Amino acid sequence: TYNVCNKDVKIDELKKYMKDLVPTYMIPNYFIKLKEIPINSNGKADRKALSTIKYTVERENKYEAPRNDFEKTLKKIVEKEMNITNVGIDDDILNLGADSLTLMRITAELLDQKYEVSIQKFYEQKTIRKINDTLYQEIDENDKLKDDVYYNFNEKDPSEKIKFSNVLLTGATGFLGIHILNELIKNTKANVYCLIRDKNGINGKERLKEKISFYFGKELLREIDKRIYVIKGDISNNLLGLDEDEYKKLGYKIDLVIHSAAIVNHYGKKEIFELINVTGTKNIAEFCKSYNIKLNHISTISVSADFVSNKKISKEFNEHTLYIGQPYKKNIYVKTKFEAEYNLLKEMAKGLEVTIFRLGNITSRYCDGKFQENDYQNAFLNRILSFIKIGKVTNEMLDYEFDMSPVDICSEFIIKILEYQSSYGKVFHIANNNKITLKGIIKALNISNIKIVTQEEFRNSIKNNKEIIGIINDITNNVIFGKNININSDFTQNYLNKLNLNWCKINNSYIRKYVKKYIE
């Protein structure tokens, strides 16, 4: 943390002061004293200028030197990429100021030196010593879940519609969440209460207005305070961050909850993932149990661990299963979404009315190609762009099948499904059954300079091209390009057919709209 102070203040005094302002895990171990904070033309802290300031780590703890070649290599790379000196093996790399982009560059440099270290390893181990000590440690996949959790899977066909007037929506500022909000306003008569926390000094209402303006414009904005209401709260807090009276009033008012809030990055601080994805979901379930409210939970097909499993699993993953022996602990996002779903399935078995929607690859709108605001963070898109940029693929990668599920179609299907009583007590796979291959994308984009190479040649090409962050991140985070887990969504497809809902075909025009802007 950079700070400006007119007098000498001890680090422990700064930490003590910050304890009253932020959670303990957000208090940094390192403070960098400056004469002044550089300001950019917008009057904000100039992060670019801050990153160029070379400084020596000041510490309370004793400096510990590297013990082996790996630690020496990592120390050298960290100091180079972060423009600092005097990094010891017990210094917290994240608290020194490393963000996800810095960690991507560090892992790319390590890959060039024949060391494969995942970004998540930095978030979990934090220091050079701990990263070294766990470098070749296998993830313990032994699990108490010997068999899949049991729940009474409701086999009824859609017939009876439910009535709901007031919906509580979490995650309304997210890409899927904002489209669910639009779908509720457009195609139901319900009022929607959006639980949103303040962030970076911007209150929840303003945050929602910004997102609505970006994705939908004035028509939906007019519904604020008419059918769309913002409640300041936080799913990770007790009573959802509300006082007891507010919590009670909300509980008696709401007929239906759609829980879309989640941390969806594939790496990050374990504590935050667990707080939002696991504890937050428990808090929402507790709210629904207390007031006998139907719960619709947005999960992910990634709980199958299909993209991190490097071994063939014979058992099929479908809507009736959760744990089939897949290595879900390999990825922090998958692990926490798995645990959230596991907890909800247990609640379902006890009588809570829950519908779980496992989403596939959510892509741009089918109607007009509009994509998520923070598209540069989309792992699926980055992967495709990386293949195109490097100009090389393997045969296995060319034939790998995946879904492209437009966000407007996903949100429409979710709302249509949850309107039926028979949908509760079920799990659905909301993923386009009209699959596409990388070969199909390359053909649609009319790209002719892609070479087919061996796995070894492909990996060597990546190691010499550190700009291909999307693929480097996949390699260092154990992402697999192959089908080691058989995912079956027949139950969902049959259910959709009964509702006369059909997935769109992904044509060349849609693919070009999705990718072309980024290639240019």
What are these regions (language model features)?
Residues 12, 16, 61-87, 102-112, ...:
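Thiotemplate assembly-line natural product biosynthesis machinery
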Residues 33, 75-99, 103, 112-121, ...:
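Phosphopantetheine carrier-protein modules
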Residues 91-113, 126, 130, 171-179:
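Phosphopantetheine-attachment site and its flanking helix in carrier
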Residues 251-252, 256-260, 267-275, 279-332, ...:
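Conserved Rossmann-fold NAD(P)-dependent oxidoreductase catalytic core, especially the SDR/UDP-sugar
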Residues 22-45, 86, 102-105, 113-135:
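AMP-binding/adenylate-forming catalytic domain of the ANL superfamily
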